[in-house]
Amino acid sequence: MKKQIFSTLVLSMCLLLPFSLYSQEQRKKVGVVLSGGGAKGMAHIKALKVIEEAGIPIDYIAGTSMGAIVGGLYAIGYTPEQLDSMVRKQNWTFLLSDRIKRSAMSLTDRERSEKFIVSIPFTKSPKDAASSGGIIKGQNLANLFSDLTMGYHDSINFDKLPIPFACVAANVVNGEQIIFHNGILSTAMRASMAIPGVFTPVRQDSMVLVDGGIVNNYPADVVKAMGADVIIGVDVQNALKKADKLNSAPDILGQIVDITCQSNHEKNVDLTDTYIRVNVDGYSSASFTPAAIDTLMRRGEEAAKAQWNSLLALKKKIGIAEDYTPKQHGPYSSLSNARTVYVTDISFSGVEVDDKKWLMKKCNLKENSDITTQQIEQALYQLRGSQSYSSASYTLKETPEGYHLNFLLQEKYERRINLGIRFDSEEIASLLVNAT
């Protein structure tokens, strides 16, 4: 009798299983869109956490600028907790500069860097101009992106990521929107946040790519085109200021930026099923202080929780039960967490082959040896500290024998005007000007 009951239960489960699987396959696909907004985009992290807590599956994610960075990292498996920890431990003043660590600089260069407050690039030829276009090259930020995306340094199809991903940049050659669905992930993220005039653009083929916010700062249409039936959006853009609030040059400039970023905004909001608008009053794209980051994250969580009932109601529209639990997302296990990799060969792009011996000595690295991520980082600072290269980045690609480490170098063509102020008891103050 027991055997008969057991057989009946097994048969029932087998009959029900296909219906359960069919139901899951037939559910509507969910897309998340994350707007641009610089530092204000820190709010995205905690908003994603709340979406997860609501039991909403995320099938696609798209973003612009900081939304592209958070979205790209989330797409490869970073959890909101990992992202929270990562952003809090960064030295944002250093990251948002092209400063080189003192330990990698010669004594002369150390003394020079301490004298001058501002360093402004200028060029003398079209060849020089190709490496310019902004006050900050974003070297330290780009290297952070490379560290964070280890394991994804090849040119890949972003649809093949754990969560399909896309991000938006703008081609200033013709004003067109460029949607990254493939390529090198860290490069796509860097292009999407290249604020015009602040960060140098990313040059790819015949395109000159800058922050996607000027063409589509809230790309709900992009995530819909990817296949999303239901869209959840997190928007960290500032509301336009009234006339009585526009009292200074920074106010006017900020308003112009915000107006530019409004392109297609209302149309994309209309595509959104649950719209999470974060209160970012009092904060700007440059609010990277620890206190600001803490507040922005908290506001992101509060804004998402304010839409809690809407999120739960979405489950019915998606076609899942109230107690549905999506597949666990992450955590991302980066090579940078392992800290040591076996490197079989090292190459240098953008330089003469004959330079390799000198470069290997400068980097203090050896082929066919274990190399830490700290050693790679130090090698980058040594290369930039030599003052021979305007930029230095790297890729680390897995091979059957180990890893291939390639340094991408750009020879230094541009010159810079360095400005500083010197105080002493006799001259009181004097302006320091220097060209390098």
Q: What is the predicted function of each stretch?
A:
Residues 1-27:
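Bacterial Sec-dependent N-terminal signal peptides
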Residues 21-64, 72-381, 385-392, 396-397, ...:
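Patatin-like phospholipase
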Residues 363, 395, 415-423, 431-436:
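Transmembrane beta-strand segments that form the barrel wall of outer-membrane beta-barrel proteins
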